[in-house]
């Protein structure tokens, strides 16, 4: 077995597929999910190494795994304690498959317990950054520096290892920070190598994927595009598809893919609900209709959506009403333009994760919903939806969609457009949405985007936008007392939107944005800056 991290050949950018397609002879790493918030992030990290990965339930049987024939298995972290009576367990026959296994946090503790070791509540939990001291630098820890920072988040610890296991690394508070049974290719880490805070975490994941599982870097953007087009054609055949085009990278990439797959059987419809940013509806129609000759049906539904939100202040109700009205408009327009059999949506992994995030109840052992917020693409769909869904991007993260978009010729201004929520400015207005408040926020938001664009900093941020609060503050302008709205600036740095940090913006830029908003946007006399990270906050205010 090689002891050097493989240097990958110059391959195209890597991406995942949408489903487990048994017809394809594809190497795969399976992640068994025990309710961790990072399970999909593990999958993303593996895909970045040009190896396909899929997240499955922890209940997946050893027999099913044998049929799937993965090159390796990863047991995710989770919020529970393995010594609880109803703690989630994996099929113990997994250990007899002869497939390499890596347990992460809870996954490592479960491995230890099921194989005869012992796990107890730690005298002192370990949360945040920790220095990893390496005792055995082979296999899993090849090219991981001694003293490297890793991210810990655990209240339990392994106090006795199963027979055949040895300690690979420790930290100040955790004796068994990394363990291994080299003969059986069973490995465990108490930390989270998948998160950005773990400095050499990617090196460790590559070691598992390439050294231990002996995978090859075969998963590419081109492979995803080719397979997705084949899957769309196989599913849709000669049926007609209706696509909700928003102008963002998700729906635009989907439009290009669908147009390549089914041509004129695709109808793109842009429903202008009145919640988009300044100038976006006009620019969208120009790009698709005139520049790329992909016909788009324009529907002006601004008054309908605004009427639905009269008197509504609850953010979840806003999302539900917008989602419901969106589908209602779709159904009405489909009768006029149809018939249509499929509704195409640019749903992504983070949409699915945040709309129905799951946990495992320690009392019952069952997965339960821990709802964060209803996404426009997911939570707002009515139960009587007439369309069948086609969601080719459902397993992709935002950066992966951008890679696909770029590879199929999507304009760079769309590829690198900041993420924008389906309900648009309606959920950046805290409280009731009115025409007046929309105009205030739209103008303030334009100033933010205009200034960071002038400074050449647009692509330095994951998102940069304004939020309008439902309060007023006292000010003085031209020797006159004012009583007007405050605007919140939200500029975010992130890799994937799963976690995010507030951006350390130069004071001069903040000052310029603030001065312009106060002077150019009628009804605003104060600007504040949001310095909350995700978690504990979310990127959007609603």
Curated annotation (Swiss-Prot):
The keyword Transcription does not apply. It is an enzyme of class 6 (ligase). Pfam families: GATase (PF00117), GMP_synt_C (PF00958). Keywords: ATP-binding, Glutamine amidotransferase, GMP biosynthesis, Ligase, Nucleotide-binding, Purine biosynthesis. GO terms for molecular function: ATP binding; GMP synthase activity. Its EC number is 6.3.5.2. Residues 28-218 form the Glutamine amidotransferase type-1 domain. The active site is at 105 (nucleophile), 192, 194. GO terms for cellular component: cytosol. It catalyses: XMP + L-glutamine + ATP + H2O = GMP + L-glutamate + AMP + diphosphate + 2 H(+). InterPro entries: Class_I_gatase-like (IPR029062), GATASE (IPR017926), GMP_synth_C (IPR001674), GMP_synth_GATase (IPR004739), GMP_synthase (IPR022955), GMPS_ATP_PPase_dom (IPR025777), Rossmann-like_a/b/a_fold (IPR014729). It comes from the Bacteria. The keyword Transport does not apply. ATP binds at residues 246-252. Residues 219-417 form the GMPS ATP-PPase domain. Signal peptide: none annotated. Pathway: Purine metabolism; GMP biosynthesis; GMP from XMP (L-Gln route): step 1/1. Catalyzes the synthesis of GMP from XMP. PANTHER family: GMP SYNTHASE [GLUTAMINE-HYDROLYZING], GMP SYNTHASE-RELATED. Homodimer. This is GMP synthase [glutamine-hydrolyzing]. It comes from Crocosphaera subtropica (strain ATCC 51142 / BH68).
